[in-house]
């Protein structure tokens, strides 16, 4: 493309190349819209077709996964690995197992992951992978056979210095263990090729908690910069998986009253707030094969909003921790009308572009996921460091490093987030992540 093109012409170029990849186009639009004024002031970043290269994955691997279920029936799923950018290190990003998984979603996640990983300051590139396999309702044997079948193709594309996957939606410690075990068998090599492993074979303490803890560390720093804090705040959390659980735990430690959790079927509301005992029971229920938030609500006699999200309730802080585009304009209007002070993304792109703009216009503090939920991948990087050194750190050391990294990410966002009274964290995160990746790409030439 001509180096003098406009923002809209660039976005149209991206849309035209992949007209059906709406999630990916949305992610590119969100990033480029905030970057464009910076790019106009720094024209070196529009040379050498850098932007065109940045929005095109270095490699996409697509393959079928053939496995046998418990009824001895042959099943066929699709799987992908998007190796988006290795400019600053090996590809790094999770594997997602969910029926909604497609190439557009994985490209959007890999694109976001590239900037998120850059923000951590650790030497990690960006990638993402997954399958339309649904682990819900499957036996452990079926999940194991699927993971092993998937690895018979994927293993040849991974390596400790090439591509290091981790977990994501539908992929927890069990699935990581199955995949890592098959990788070891096929490659005859025990080098670190997965993070989020069990502690018995190279995992890191605090890794399961890291995304949720990091979200709260970042949000607390954001609140403090603007004269507030979690202490005494009413908090709504969406989701009830790994990120939501540990965000609830850490927010409680900081003195917040967390009143909601949710899943795809509805929301539980506890006006008195979660306690350690209640949270432990929720985690136990969700760990069971068919555990739902509705079961937790029934057990404790709590309000259950069937088919609803938590955003209609009056709260001070909202932490969307479920899935992409869960918080739309209507939900944003409700939160703003009820006096929300801050929104921080625990999930990947859970807030639509329109809702994000609405929060910013209303003066609501807004922390984008690429900064706020970077704690998970940051601790994955720390797990890689421990594996490389053949060491295991104590939980306190990992947690302290995580806290420090999240404060560094917050500082980078503030540095690039404008000079007004209120920091534009979307702008700050996008520019800070972009500059690191772009400088590396320019230094390495046209490759």
Curated annotation (Swiss-Prot):
It catalyses: L-glutamate + NADP(+) + H2O = 2-oxoglutarate + NH4(+) + NADPH + H(+). Competitively inhibited by homoserine and by glutamine. This is NADP-specific glutamate dehydrogenase. GO terms for cellular component: cytoplasm; cytosol; glutamate dehydrogenase complex. InterPro entries: Aminoacid_DH-like_N_sf (IPR046346), Glu/Leu/Phe/Val/Trp_DH (IPR006095), Glu/Leu/Phe/Val/Trp_DH_C (IPR006096), Glu/Leu/Phe/Val/Trp_DH_dimer (IPR006097), Glu/Leu/Phe/Val_DH_AS (IPR033524), Glu_DH (IPR014362), Glu_Leu_Phe_Val_DH (IPR050724), NAD(P)-bd_dom_sf (IPR036291). Catalyzes the reversible oxidative deamination of glutamate to alpha-ketoglutarate and ammonia. The keyword NADP applies. The gene is gdhA. Transmembrane segments: none annotated. The enzyme remains active when heat treated or when left at room temperature for several months but is inactivated by freezing. Its EC number is 1.4.1.4. Optimum pH is 8 and 9 for the reductive amination and for the oxidative deamination, respectively. One of its GO terms (molecular function) is identical protein binding. NADP(+) binds at residues 211, 242. Induction: Induced by growth on glucose and ammonia. It comes from Escherichia coli (strain K12). Gene3D superfamilies: Glutamate Dehydrogenase, chain A, domain 3, Leucine Dehydrogenase, chain A, domain 1, NAD(P)-binding Rossmann-like Domain. It comes from the Bacteria. Substrate binds at residues 92, 113, 116, 167, 380. The record marks 168 as: Important for catalysis. Homohexamer. Keywords: NADP, Oxidoreductase. The active site is at residue 128. One of its GO terms (biological process) is glutamate metabolic process. It holds the Pfam family ELFV_dehydrog. It is an enzyme of class 1 (oxidoreductase).
